[in-house]
């Protein structure tokens, strides 16, 4: 089985500045130390053709950072990501321009993805039909609801037939019927042997479509393996976490995040 995505020791750091003075010092003072946040820390995993990998973890764990890196919109501070094939990222608002109409966004986004105008003209009716936006396709996207934006973004990306698909909470908004249609399309891609990364807090969807689970906690890969090996462990953790008081949940998050801040 061929490797489609190989992630090796990936780290993503963000320098934290309290004011512009600290930012300036970081530029002009050699070896100036400042607080640094590790969004991801030494994370490695390999995805093969046909893998549908669920990226799970509580909010702020690093799932979206990882999905953006796989998609290529973020670069790692350290480490390397190799991709074998075209990647398409589906996230709410991803790549959409609020000033443009829906149909203008289709052309703009597909031009950015390397499609010719002839290809775009051919695919546009299919995208509009899948989106179910009707006459709203001619309205500015800034007037769309979050569900409508998700429909447009999903329809563009799913119709371009990528080799690797990254879905980041794009099915968490919008109506249930459209979400099911999207899941049916994802299942088609799964049957075709495409590689899919699926970020969701909906454990029912994760269990139904994923073959493997990557559990991310505090920017690190806590567990990675087959669905039936990892998901029950994560669901047990999640149930225990939800039983805690808001204060206990906040303390748990703060304790995790404290390990992600260093001065360097």
UniProtKB/Swiss-Prot annotation:
One cellular component term from this protein's GO annotations in UniProt: plasma membrane
Under which EC number(s) is this enzyme classified? 7.5.2.4
Provide the alphabetized UniProt keywords: ATP-binding, Cell membrane, Membrane, Nucleotide-binding, Translocase, Transport
Keyword Nucleotide-binding appears in the UniProt entry: yes
* Tree of life domain: Bacteria
Residues where ATP binds: 57-64
Q: Which InterPro entries match?
A: AAA+_ATPase, ABC_transporter-like_ATP-bd, ABC_transporter-like_CS, ABC_transpr_TagH-like, Bact_Polysacc_Export_ATP-bd, P-loop_NTPase
* Residue ranges of the TM segments: none
Task: Show the catalytic activity.
Answer: ATP + H2O + teichoic acidSide 1 = ADP + phosphate + teichoic acidSide 2
Q: Which residues form the ABC transporter domain?
A: 22-243
Per UniProt, subcellular location reads as:
Cell membrane
Note the topology in the membrane: Peripheral membrane protein
Q: Kind of enzyme, top EC level?
A: translocase
Q: Give the PROSITE patterns listed for this entry.
A: ABC_TRANSPORTER_1, ABC_TRANSPORTER_2, TAGH
GO molecular function terms here?
Answer: ABC-type teichoic acid transporter activity; ATP binding; ATP hydrolysis activity
What is known about its subunit structure? The complex is composed of two ATP-binding proteins (TagH) and two transmembrane proteins (TagG).
The entry's function note states: Part of the ABC transporter complex TagGH involved in teichoic acids export. Responsible for energy coupling to the transport system.
By sequence similarity, the record places it as follows: Belongs to the ABC transporter superfamily. Teichoic acids exporter (TC 3.A.1.104.1) family.
State the protein's name: Teichoic acids export ATP-binding protein TagH
Species name: Staphylococcus saprophyticus subsp. saprophyticus (strain ATCC 15305 / DSM 20229 / NCIMB 8711 / NCTC 7292 / S-41)
The organism that produces this protein has a lineage beginning with: Bacteria, Bacillati, Bacillota, Bacilli, Bacillales
